[in-house]
């Protein structure tokens, strides 16, 4: 009998909640001491409840809470992704700094060097570091 009443009253809660789930939610509200009102929710058609002076639809509230939880999980995933990207950027910046320090060191050595073979070695090392720097930027 109550299932038929619920089927007739709750017409629009969609795929997010089955009739059996709606019955559980509504009966739990009654067990918690809420009073079922004769007015119905404009969104889902289920009866509104009143408890402690607050009038609410337990079906829409349950769906809203589920959406809030999912939204919170998505926000956590986004925050984690941002933190990971920041970490990667910091690593790249650290690597960039190390490469620049090595280039500067080799330039100073190059200024002091007189031997041709050694100048060539240092110049090749600087060239490789510059190519690496361009790749990481």
Curated annotation (Swiss-Prot):
Please name the InterPro entries in this protein's record: SSSCA1 (IPR009563), UPF0148 (IPR022954), UPF0148_domain (IPR051888)
**Transmembrane regions:** none
Q: Which domain of life is it from?
A: Archaea
Q: Which residues form a coiled coil?
A: none
What is stated as this protein's family in its record?
A: Belongs to the UPF0148 family.
**Know the name of this protein?**
UPF0148 protein MJ0890
């Amino acid at each position: 009998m109550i299932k038929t009443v619920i089927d007739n009253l709750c017409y629009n809660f969609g795929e997010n909640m089955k009739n059996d789930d709606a019955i559980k939610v509504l009966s739990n509200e009654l067990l918690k001491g809420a009073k079922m009102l004769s007015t119905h929710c404009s969104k889902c058609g289920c009866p509104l409840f009143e408890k402690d002076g607050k009038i609410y639809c337990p079906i829409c509230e349950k769906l809203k809470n589920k959406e809030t939880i999912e939204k919170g999980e998505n926000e956590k995933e986004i925050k984690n992704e941002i933190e990971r990207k920041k970490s990667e950027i910091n690593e790249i910046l650290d690597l960039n700094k190390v490469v620049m320090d090595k280039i500067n060191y080799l330039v100073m050595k190059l200024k002091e060097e007189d031997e041709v073979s050694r100048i060539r070695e240092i110049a090749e090392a600087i060239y490789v570091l510059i190519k690496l720097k361009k790749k990481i930027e």
